[in-house]
């Protein structure tokens, strides 16, 4: 099995995926299509609108041709850290010990990979295409937003590993 963890993003009020969520799922589906044993792990709980992010992502994966038995929803993650912890537990329960792949937005990828690695998972990135955030102003906004989040979440993950 080759797990592909898809990190959540906003669901719109009409229950459709936001553009960021759609890009993450499409990148994971493209990547997983080339693997004989892809296991998609969409992670994300219920946000402000609609169903849980994981449920919306699972539906989109099926629309894109992923077999339902290759999708395992993780609907409890409320942020990046809790999603990593929940996916680590799920993979442990499945007996998985190999590499995992992370599908998310470019700005979010360094934090996801770091947290997965601190959690003891051999994490690698899923290639993702360009996004709206490729405009320099948005690109810097999203990058700067990650500056405090990376050390904060890393410290919390290390603390959780101790306990």
Regions found by a protein language model. Give the residues of each.
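A transmembrane-helix-recognition feature enriched in membrane-embedded lipid enzymes
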Residues: 136-163
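A structural signal for short, hydrophobic/glycine-enriched beta-strand patches
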Residues: 1-140
């Amino acid at each position: 099995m080759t797990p592909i963890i898809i990190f959540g993003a906003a669901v719109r009020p009409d229950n459709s995926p936001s553009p960021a969520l759609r890009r993450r799922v499409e990148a994971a589906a493209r990547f997983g299509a080339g693997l004989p044993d892809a296991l998609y792990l969409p992670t994300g709980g219920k946000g402000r609108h609609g169903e849980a992010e994981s449920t919306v992502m699972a539906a989109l994966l099926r629309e894109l041709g992923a077999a339902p038995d290759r999708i395992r929803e993780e609907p409890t993650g409320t942020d990046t850290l809790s999603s990593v912890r929940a996916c680590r537990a799920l993979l442990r329960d499945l007996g998985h010990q190999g590499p995992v792949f992370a599908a998310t937005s470019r700005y979010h990828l360094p934090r996801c990979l770091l947290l997965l690695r601190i959690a003891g998972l051999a994490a690698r990135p899923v290639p993702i295409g360009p996004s709206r955030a490729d405009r320099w102003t948005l690109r810097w906004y999203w990058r700067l937003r990650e500056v405090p989040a990376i050390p904060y979440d890393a410290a919390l993950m290390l603390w959780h590993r101790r306990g």
